Amino acid sequence: MPRTDNDSWDLATSVGATATMVAAARAIATNADNPLIADRFAEPLVRAVGVDFFTRWVTGDLVVADVDDTESGWQLAQMPDAMAVRTRFFDAFFQDATRAGVRQAVILASGLDARAYRLDWPAGMTVFEIDQPEVIAFKTTTLAGLGAVPRADLRTVAVDLRQDWPKALTDAGFDAGSPTAWIAEGLFGYLPPEAQDRLLDNITALSAAGSRLACEAIPNRPQQDAEKARELMRKATARWREHGFELEFGDLGYEGDRADVALYLQDLGWQSVGTQMGQLLADNGAAPIPHNDDSVTMADTIYYSSVLTA
């Protein structure tokens, strides 16, 4: 079902289910023979959500070779390594920020992110998580049931990012006068282009000098290329649906002419360094994801680390 302006979701439907899919990939990466990451909360969270397709994938009952369309450029087999190196990128970002003295972090569209529970945060650290109310409530309750305890002062902010989240964040105790480490992981593609710009504007307005931002950006592409990407994704997920997958990924994202993230942030006073997914995979000794001449795929995603200097 296509997105609407005021749509909502839980972790089994729409955009929320993509968070469960990513957590499933993290669980598989964690259980690998030589794991690049250790997220012990990923698998129990996926099991608790209860989407059969993702549970079978995590347990190995789903054979990805039977599911994947190798010509589409979107394969389940590629996701554990891709999500592992993505996770390491954002983990390292937070570690670098705290070593620099930052004591306030904001995780935008936090989904099933368990960093507040699994990273070694310094004393005096406050972590804010922002997401849909149903998503926040589910994760908080499930992790409490697992006996998990946050390793920082965790403050959840149950608000849609299309609403007045800056006020909700401030009401939760956010200090705009202190440097902040922000992450927007797997978020921009699910925002309209103008909403992406507005999000970056709001982050900047709330950020003191020395604040840091890490984000995942989708390269801009002409409409024709976007349509090809959507068709390739539909081709891939058609095979998945034969095995119980119920999402239409092609309907979840937003197309349109997007600002170049690094240039947009530069105009706002941020200095950015970008790394492509292919480089992250190579740096971590993981198998490459082939580029697709007809479309943008995971291989083309860019990860930016930015510092506010203004």
Swiss-Prot record:
Keywords: Methyltransferase, S-adenosyl-L-methionine, Transferase. It comes from the Bacteria. S-adenosyl-L-methionine binds at D131, D160, L161. It holds the Pfam family LCM. The keyword Methyltransferase applies. SUPFAM superfamilies: S-adenosyl-L-methionine-dependent methyltransferases (SSF53335). One of its GO terms (biological process) is methylation. GO terms for molecular function: methyltransferase activity. Its EC number is 2.1.1.-. Coiled coil: none annotated. Belongs to the UPF0677 family. Exhibits S-adenosyl-L-methionine-dependent methyltransferase activity. This is Putative S-adenosyl-L-methionine-dependent methyltransferase MMAR_3534.
